[in-house]
Design a protein with these regions (language model features):
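Disulfide-bonded cysteine-rich modules in secreted/extracellular proteins
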Residues: 4-8, 73-80, 284
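Short, glycine/charge-rich beta-strand/loop segments that flank catalytic centers
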Residues: 49-55, 59, 168-174, 193-199, ...
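Generic structural signal for well-ordered alpha-helical scaffold segments
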Residues: 64-68, 180-184, 278
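Electropositive phosphate-/nucleotide-binding environments in soluble metabolic enzymes
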Residues: 35, 53, 57, 120, ...
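Strand-helix-loop interaction patch of compact alpha/beta domains
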Residues: 1-10, 294
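AMP-forming adenylation/ATP pyrophosphatase catalytic core
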Residues: 81-84, 192-199, 204-413
Length: 413
C-alpha cells in the first residue's frame, strides 16, 4: 500500500486530501468537501467525484501523482482547456471519456492570466465540465516542464534575433507528448482534442490536413506533430465550423458555450511579448538603426523589439516608407529599407518532409497566405524556391508545406 497527499489553497483557505491506495483502488481516504466517500473507489472512479472547489483541487493534485486505469478499448482521453471547443470534443467522445487538463506556467506578472487556456480558472472550468456529465477528470501540473521546454526557448530565440513560435513548439512536441503519455496511463485507446484540423490517409500514410472551417483551421499550429502519432489522435471538430460548435454547446447546455476565446502564447497571459521579455532577462540595450548601406538612421531600445517586415513604430523619418529588413543580435542593430528589399525568393528550413513532393504551398505565419514553391529536400530539412517573392520572412518562424490541403512537411526557417 502507498499513501498520497494533495493540497490546494486560495484566498487564505486550505484543503487537504490524503489517500491510501492498494494498486489502483482507494482503501482509505481523508477528504472533506467532496460529494461522496472515496474509500473503495478506483482511481478512475475517484476522478469523477465532484466537490467544493478547493477540495476537488486537492483531490486532483493527489490523483495526478499516481493516476492509472485498466485499458478500455472505448475509452477516449480528451484534452480539456475549459473552453467551448474541448467541451464539445468531450460530447463527441461519449460516455467512456476521461478529461485531462495541463496546468502550465503563466507569467505571474501577466495582466490577464485568466484568459490563458492553462490557468487555474481554466482547470476548474474543465473539471466542472467533466463532472457535470459524470465523467472523470485529471489535472497534470506541468508548469516547470513547460517553462523549460517552451518558455525558455522562446526567450532564447528572441535574444538571438529570431521570431520563434511557441505554440508550434508546444503542440509539435511538448503538449501532445504529455497528453499521449497520459492517455496510455489512463487506458485510453486514443486522444481527442478540440483543435480544428483533420487526419487523412494519403499513399498509405496518415497525415494532418486543413479543417473544413478555413477561419478556424489550426493545422499550421499542429504541423510539427509526428505523423506516426496520428493513429492515436482524433480531432472530432475538424469537419465542422466554429458556429456549429457553439450551437452544439448551447443545445447541450454547456457553460463553456459562453467562455471567451483564449489567446495564443498562453504564458503571456494577455500581455505584450516585449514587456514579457524585459521581465525575463532579455536586456533592452540601446543600439543603432541603420540602412542597407550601413548609414545611421536612428536609435532603438532593443533590437528584439522589432520584427522583420515591421513598418510602424520605427521612430525613423524618411521620404519613403521604411520596413525592418533584419536585426543583428551580435551588432545590436536594426536594418531598415524599402519594401522591395524585403523580398526573398528562396527559403531554407530545418525540419522534415513527411512525404516526397516536388511542389507545395508554403505558409510561414498562421494568417499568411500560402505561396506556391518548388521543394528540394536537404540533409537537415528542405529548401523552397518560391513562385513569387515573399515579404517579412524571418529566422525562427515555422514553414508549413501543404499539398491540396494536406500537411506534407514542416520546419523552422
Amino acid at each position: 500500500m502507498i499513501e498520497v497527499v494533495g493540497d490546494s489553497s486560495r484566498n487564505g483557505e486550505v484543503a487537504l486530501v490524503r489517500l491510501t491506495l492498494d494498486g489502483d483502488r482507494i482503501v482509505d481516504a481523508d477528504a472533506d468537501g467532496l460529494e461522496r466517500p472515496l474509500a473503495g473507489l478506483s482511481l478512475l472512479e475517484a476522478a469523477a467525484v465532484p466537490g467544493e472547489k478547493l477540495a476537488a483541487d486537492a483531490l486532483a493534485n493527489a490523483l495526478a501523482q499516481v493516476f492509472r486505469a485498466t485499458p478500455e478499448p472505448n475509452r477516449v482521453a480528451v484534452a480539456m482547456s475549459g473552453g467551448v471547443d474541448s467541451a464539445v470534443a468531450l460530447l463527441h467522445a461519449g460516455r467512456d471519456a476521461i478529461g485531462v487538463t495541463l496546468r502550465l506556467w503563466i507569467d505571474p506578472a501577466a495582466p490577464d492570466s485568466e484568459r490563458a487556456c492553462c490557468s487555474p480558472e481554466a482547470v476548474i472550468a474543465a473539471r466542472e465540465t467533466c463532472h457535470a456529465r459524470g465523467l472523470p477528470h485529471v489535472t497534470l501540473d506541468l508548469r516547470d516542464e513547460f517553462r523549460r521546454a517552451v518558455v525558455a526557448p522562446f526567450i532564447r530565440g528572441y535574444a538571438a534575433g529570431e521570431t520563434p513560435n511557441p505554440c508550434i513548439r508546444c503542440n509539435g512536441s511538448f503538449r501532445f507528448a504529455e497528453l499521449l503519455a497520459f492517455a496510455e496511463r489512463a487506458g485510453a485507446s486514443r486522444l481527442a482534442t478540440g483543435h480544428y484540423a483533420r487526419i487523412v490517409e494519403r499513399d498509405g500514410f496518415r497525415l494532418l490536413a486543413r479543417a473544413r472551417d478555413p477561419v478556424k483551421d489550426q493545422s499550421y499550429m499542429l504541423a510539427r506533430l509526428d505523423p506516426r502519432l496520428l493513429g492515436r489522435i482524433w480531432f472530432p471538430l475538424g469537419e465542422q465550423t466554429k458556429d456549429e460548435t457553439r450551437a452544439e454547446a448551447e443545445r447541450a447546455g454547456l457553460a463553456a458555450s459562453r467562455r471567451a476565446e483564449s489567446q495564443e502564447a498562453c504564458f503571456l497571459g494577455g500581455g505584450d511579448y516585449r514587456d514579457f521579455l524585459r521581465r525575463h532577462g532579455v536586456a533592452a540595450e540601446p543600439g543603432e538603426i541603420i540602412d542597407e548601406d550601413g548609414r545611421h538612421r536612428g536609435k532603438h531600445a532593443g533590437f528584439w523589439g522589432f520584427t522583420t517586415g515591421q513598418r510602424r513604430g520605427l521612430g525613423v523619418s524618411s521620404h519613403q516608407p521604411l520596413y525592418v529588413l533584419s536585426t543583428d543580435a551580435q551588432a545590436n542593430t536594426v536594418v531598415v529599407g524599402p519594401r522591395e528589399s524585403l523580398a526573398v525568393e528562396t527559403i531554407s528550413a530545418r525540419g522534415r518532409l513527411y512525404v516526397q513532393v516536388d511542389r507545395a504551398e508554403v505558409k510561414w505565419r498562421y494568417r499568411s497566405p500560402a505561396v506556391p514553391a518548388a521543394v528540394v529536400q536537404t540533409e537537415r530539412g528542405f529548401r523552397l524556391h518560391l513562385d513569387a517573392p515573399a515579404y517579412g520572412v524571418s529566422p525562427g518562424q515555422a514553414a508549413v508545406l501543404y499539398d491540396d490541403g494536406v500537411v506534407v512537411g514542416a520546419g523552422v526557417l
